[in-house]
């Protein structure tokens, strides 16, 4: 690998250092080792890009190894899906391997462990073993079965293999150090009994190796030079090395485990358990639901292999876990589709536009550029006629000055077509506009070169011809979770943050060029965003998934929410300046509206914490947030934080702050009890009559 082309990340630096220290480049070998118990997600895509990318950079083989050591959760369906996803991402493995390929070798090594006194059969219950193992701050104690004889251990282990015992009656543990500061080194489990059918080995085995025993040894058997995994496996490295020490042949390559940070993506979850929960509880429609963080879900939504590879490269490799905003991923797909997606016209909330001076029965086929970013994309023909569909939001009967779309007596251009002027409307019995009537400038055809065609008007609208439009189902997807880190709040179930509006389905109309569109074909619906043909499409009905908007609507929403809270904090000062209760209520109601308009839990939580300060305005605002927000409660904060808010507020110079703190405390029984002595002391010293009256009622 050329080190001059780019700065090396710390993973590449490790490899380069090993090469300098004598490791032959021909000995480099990497692997991607998924467990086939679910579908791959965006986090796996980054690990895939890392390992296969290293294989490409160093011209080294990369194995795809399935860590299939738990038949209770693993299925062939997941094996097939993983292979499909890796290939779709554009990567090719050198060898397809399975941990189950090595079951016999692992068993043989284990027999040697037992013979050397390095492993024993433990017959404790899981509860007994948990107590005996100790805690991070207290040493463990030896199992009462730790000193079984070699003969007894061999007999029991072979009988475990023969299927004589029920699950949970015995396990095999390695004999290491029950006083180790690393809990994983306190005689870790090597084998457990599982009477489950294995998707590859059938019922041949009923004892299965644990991850820590199988993983490093699989690396060793495959002669993997570098075993890269995420940071949660850092404590496992000591055990990884200990197991290798017992079997290592100095004539062979010794694998090296090193760790990198997990990429957590905002507004989603990547835990397989939580993804499975979303599927099983019908919050989504399967593993490939376009709202899921699975690769199959992202693919169905319209993400491309190039966009996911670019995302992995853009976010890079880090040593600390970090939260990547989903807008980075959305930027990557916009960048890709902007270059490759044909531009077409579709109307998703249609209202009929009738051009009254356009001849009845006439139609024109106009030239439309397929993609201005690709000079080779060419042009297509689109039909223009007297009756068109436009977006309902693109017309206002009475429009403000800065409305740059169609209205009465106002001109706009129809994309690739003519300039039209709004004249009148037809409404139904309840006042909803059903038709907009307009006239067109006959000399204003776009691209005709006439003086009229070059006139500047306030805006350009997309449209489709009513007579030629194809009806389509359009699925408008939004972020699955309202909170940026839904599973990071100990006090909350992540499902509480599921976005109830993450999917809306509309019937729209698309131009006729899309009649032959196939599954996974991608388009830019002009002015609306990027859309992908869904697998549910048929010859009778097209179905499109919204991949991503042309702009990040959530960024705008986030800024609005943040600005709303900041402006409310400024309003708080007025509360202290006005004289009457009525005026204070008016100020509080304005602040209340701003607080209740914010749905972002993390934003609310962080802003409240920041306002626990020795400042009456900040403290009053924090109490108002607790009082008026439907998103946060005292239970969403740790005990120390919430009690700090109360105690600082109750000591505030402002009686208004003290009053709001007491009102919040009245609804927070836990904190009320915890601060009982503090409140009793305040009752004796409080001088403000209103505050004292409230205190006495507590």
Range-by-range predicted roles:
Residues 64, 68-70, 76, 98, ...:
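Active-site cores that bind ATP or allylic diphosphates and position pyrophosphate for catalysis
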Residues 78-102, 110, 119:
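A glycine-rich helix N-cap at a beta->alpha junction
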Residues 311-575:
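Substrate/cofactor-recognition hotspot
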Residues 571-578, 606-612, 644-651, 678-686:
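Alpha-solenoid HEAT/Armadillo-like helical repeat scaffolds in large eukaryotic proteins
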Residues 586-589, 620-624, 644, 660, ...:
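Alpha-solenoid helical repeat scaffolds
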Residues 593-603, 612-613, 627-641, 653, ...:
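Alpha-helix capping and inter-helical loop/turn segments
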């Amino acid at each position: 690998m050329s080190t001059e082309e780019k700065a090396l990340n710390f993973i590449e630096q490790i490899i380069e250092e090993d090469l300098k220290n004598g490791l032959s480049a021909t000995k480099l070998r990497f692997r991607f080792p998924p467990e086939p118990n679910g579908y791959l997600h965006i986090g796996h895509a980054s690990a895939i890009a890392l390992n296969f990318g290293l294989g490409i950079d160093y011209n080294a083989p990369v194995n795809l190894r399935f860590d299939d050591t738990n038949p209770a959760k693993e299925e062939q369906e997941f094996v097939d899906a993983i292979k499909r996803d890796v290939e779709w991402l554009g990567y090719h493995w050198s060898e397809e391997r399975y941990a189950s390929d090595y079951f016999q070798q692992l068993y043989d090594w284990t027999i040697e462990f037992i013979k050397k006194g390095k492993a024993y059969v433990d017959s404790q219950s899981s509860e007994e073993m948990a107590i005996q193992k100790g805690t991070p701050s207290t040493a463990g104690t030896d199992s009462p079965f730790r000193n079984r004889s070699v003969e007894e251990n061999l007999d029991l282990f072979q009988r475990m293999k023969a299927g004589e015992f029920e699950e949970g009656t015995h396990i095999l543990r390695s004999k290491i150090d029950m006083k180790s500061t690393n809990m994983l080194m306190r005689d870790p489990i090597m084998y457990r009994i599982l009477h489950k059918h294995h998707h590859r080995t059938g019922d041949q085995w009923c004892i299965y190796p644990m991850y820590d025993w199988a993983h490093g040894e699989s690396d060793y058997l495959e002669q993997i030079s570098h075993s890269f995994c995420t940071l949660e496996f850092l404590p496992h490295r000591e055990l990884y090395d200990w197991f290798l020490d017992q079997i290592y042949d100095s004539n062979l390559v010794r694998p090296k485990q090193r760790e990198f940070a997990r990429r957590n993506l905002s507004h989603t979850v990547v835990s397989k358990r939580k993804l499975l929960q979303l599927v099983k509880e019908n919050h989504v429609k399967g593993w490939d639901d376009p709202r899921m963080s699975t690769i199959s879900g992202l693919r169905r939504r319209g993400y491309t292999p190039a966009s996911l590879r670019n995302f992995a490269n853009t976010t890079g490799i880090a040593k600390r876990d970090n939260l990547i905003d989903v807008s980075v991923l959305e930027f990557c797909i916009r960048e890709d589709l902007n270059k490759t997606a044909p531009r077409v016209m579709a109307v998703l909330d249609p209202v009929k536009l009738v051009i009254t001076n356009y001849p009845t029965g006439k139609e024109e086929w106009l030239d439309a550029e397929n993609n201005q970013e690709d000079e080779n994309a060419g042009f297509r023909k689109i039909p223009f006629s007297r009756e068109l569909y436009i977006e309902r939001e693109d017309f206002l009967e009475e429009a403000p000055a800065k409305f740059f779309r169609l209205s009465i007596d106002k001109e706009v251009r129809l994309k690739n077509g003519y300039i039209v002027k709004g004249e009148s409307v037809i409404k139904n019995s309840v006042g909803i506009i059903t038709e907009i009537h307009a006239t067109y400038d006959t000399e204003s055809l776009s691209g005709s070169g006439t003086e009229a065609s070059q006139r500047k008007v306030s805006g350009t609208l997309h449209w489709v011809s009513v007579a030629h439009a194809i009806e389509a189902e359009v699925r408008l997807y939004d972020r699955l979770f309202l909170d940026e880190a839904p599973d990071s709040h100990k006090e909350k179930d992540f499902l509480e943050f599921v976005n109830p509006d993450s999917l809306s389905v509309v019937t729209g109309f698309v131009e006729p060029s899309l009649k032959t569109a196939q599954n996974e074909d991608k388009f830019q619906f002009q002015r609306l965003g990027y859309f992908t043909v869904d697998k549910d499409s048929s010859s009778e009905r097209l179905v499109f998934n919204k991949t991503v908007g042309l702009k990040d609507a959530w960024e705008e929403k986030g800024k609005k929410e943040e600005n709303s809270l900041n402006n409310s904090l400024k309003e708080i000062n007025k509360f202290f300046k006005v004289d009457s209760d009525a005026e204070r209520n008016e100020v509080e109601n304005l602040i209340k509206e701003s607080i209740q308009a914010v749905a972002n839990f993390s934003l609310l939580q962080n802003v409240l914490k920041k306002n626990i300060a020795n400042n009456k305005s900040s403290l009053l605002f924090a109490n108002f947030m607790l009082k008026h927000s439907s998103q946060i409660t005292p239970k969403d904060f740790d005990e120390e934080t919430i009690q700090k808010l109360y105690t600082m507020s109750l000591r505030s110079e402002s009686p208004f702050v003290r009053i709001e703190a007491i009102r919040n405390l009245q609804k927070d029984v836990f904190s009320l009890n915890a601060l009982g002595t503090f409140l009793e002391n305040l009752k004796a010293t409080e001088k403000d009559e209103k505050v004292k009256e409230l205190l006495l009622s507590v």
